[in-house]
């Protein structure tokens, strides 16, 4: 079976870290016997090339110096900061449309799988209709945000959805947004971690949390929101045997709280920094990895908190500045320290995960209405053996079942964040139970074997019809 994968981004060279989940997806499809070609835009004149033995067809849409609409940053963000880039949208669609026709005429794929359907559904539609090739549209959430900004996008998406033979969404949250546009059947098809397999990285540790024992068995048969019972039964554990607890973490001198991600509004980092007010400095440390537009603003917020920590009367200062002191009754006299690491090498990032005690994603619905479509970073943190604290927004509840595979808290609630960290720090048994639940959740819903098996079932059904 042949599948043409279309997207706005694909690795430009072997070491490129762009869309690792899509690259991993392609690798697993090939491993399952599917022939793959990729269609993606050029970047600064980049010609067609091969990555991991997969041919990547690059379509040109502007002079080389202007071909910066995609890669390194999302196209919507780029167009917002550089409005002239919107002029490239028309040649982007036209040239992608032509290249798609050429590939399909010559290669004749059995299925076209288009990620980010606006605008890639329209790049694929001509070839799909002309050569009678089934079209799969794959939504990741970002394209749906455009509807709030540009009302004319909704009818275009509604039409495109109606032309597709199958629609994938990365979470039940995204699926609900799609159905609000057009009431069609939507397959929830999340993407798994891009980390190496559990067996490849597992090692025995003597300095782990007390009470954490590898090889703990878990119950089976729980109903799942992301898959039918049949699909759940077909999703095999990544190690091929009884689910095991992930890598265990040492007890540090301080309870280390780790955030990894872009410093943008919807990540809710400001509320994590506020949570430090409720965490004593002798017990807790917050480590913020990554960078972005809000980095300097967040550093200033943390620096102000640090100055308060250094003064004798910081508690009174904080209480006098807030409108509702009742909610700040738990403010610590010496708040937890906050460390910004910047962007890290893979080795340094791995060490951050290895020495952390909990992973946090304090996501919010931002001022643009955007939020987490799924939260793959949570799956990766689970795989690496970290208990999870995350906000109850977007697609996050598909990954984190409150009290089972992690702790969910209300968005924009620093007190709830701090309380969750304190619970985990004080209760190793709770951590053990959450890690066991996380392992089960991953094995049931987020293993690549299960994800790819379900995708191929859809491909085969469409090609037969």
What do the predicted segments below correspond to?
Residues 37-40, 57-58, 137-140, 154-198, ...:
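Donor nucleotide-sugar binding/catalytic pocket of nucleotide-sugar-dependent glycosyltransferases
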Residues 402-403, 407-414, 423-429:
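Conserved acidic donor-binding segment of nucleotide-sugar-dependent glycosyltransferases
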Residues 1-60:
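N-terminal subdomain of nucleotide-sugar transferases
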Residues 378, 383, 387-390, 400:
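Short hydrophobic beta-strand element within catalytic cores of glycosyltransferases
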Residues 416, 423, 430-445, 454-457, ...:
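A short, well-ordered alpha-helix in the C-terminal region of glycosyltransferases
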Residues 299-309, 313-348:
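Nucleotide-activated donor-binding/catalytic signature segment of Leloir-type glycosyltransferases, i.e.
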Residues 20, 255, 259-278, 293-296, ...:
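A conserved mid-protein helix/loop that constitutes part of the nucleotide-sugar donor-binding site
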Residues 354-369, 386:
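Acidic donor-binding loop of glycosyltransferase active sites
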């Amino acid at each position: 079976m042949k599948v043409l994968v279309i997207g706005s981004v694909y690795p430009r060279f072997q070491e490129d870290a762009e869309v690792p989940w899509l690259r991993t997806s392609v690798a697993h499809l090939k491993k399952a016997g599917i022939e793959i070609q990729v269609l993606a835009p050029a970047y600064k004149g980049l010609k067609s090339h091969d990555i991991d033995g997969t041919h990547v067809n690059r379509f040109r849409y502007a002079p080389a110096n202007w071909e910066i609409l995609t890669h390194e940053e999302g196209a919507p963000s780029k167009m917002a900061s550089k409005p002239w880039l919107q002029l490239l949208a028309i040649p982007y669609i036209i040239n992608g449309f032509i290249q798609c026709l050429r590939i399909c005429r010559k290669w004749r794929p059995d299925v076209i799988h288009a990620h980010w359907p606006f605008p890639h559904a329209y790049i694929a539609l001509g070839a799909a209709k002309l050569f009678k090739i089934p079209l799969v549209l794959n939504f990741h959430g970002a394209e749906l945000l455009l509807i709030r900004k540009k009302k004319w996008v909704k009818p275009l998406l509604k039409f495109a959805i109606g032309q597709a033979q199958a629609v994938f969404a990365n979470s039940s949250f995204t699926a609900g947004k799609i159905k609000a546009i057009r009431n069609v059947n939507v397959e929830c098809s999340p993407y798994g971690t891009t980390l190496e397999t559990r067996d490849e990285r597992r090692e025995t540790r003597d300095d782990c949390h007390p009470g954490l024992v590898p090889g703990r068995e878990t119950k089976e048969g729980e109903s799942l929101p992301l898959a039918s019972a049949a699909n759940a039964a077909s999703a095999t554990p990544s190690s091929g045997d009884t689910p095991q607890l992930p890598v265990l973490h040492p007890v540090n001198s301080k309870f280390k709280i780790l955030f990894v991600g872009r410093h943008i509004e919807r990540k809710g980092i400001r509320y994590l920094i506020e949570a430090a007010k409720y965490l004593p400095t002798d017990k807790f440390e917050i480590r913020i990895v990554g960078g972005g537009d809000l980095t300097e603003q967040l550093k200033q917020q943390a620096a102000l908190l640090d100055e308060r920590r250094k003064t004798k009367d910081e508690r009174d200062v904080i209480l006098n500045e807030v409108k509702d002191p009742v909610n700040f009754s738990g403010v610590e006299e010496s708040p937890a320290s906050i460390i910004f690491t910047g962007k890290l090498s893979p080795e340094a990032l791995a060490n951050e995960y290895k020495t952390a005690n909990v992973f946090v994603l304090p996501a919010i619905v931002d001022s643009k209405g955007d939020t987490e479509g799924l939260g793959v970073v949570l799956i990766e943190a689970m795989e690496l053996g970290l208990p999870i604290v995350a906000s109850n927004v977007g697609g996050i509840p598909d990954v984190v079942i409150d009290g089972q595979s992690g702790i969910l808290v209300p968005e924009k609630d620093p007190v709830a964040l701090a309380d969750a960290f304190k619970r985990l720090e004080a209760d190793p048994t709770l951590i053990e139970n959450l890690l066991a639940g996380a392992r089960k959740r991953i094995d049931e819903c987020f293993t690549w074997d299960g994800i790819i098996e379900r995708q191929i079932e859809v491909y085969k059904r469409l090609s037969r019809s």
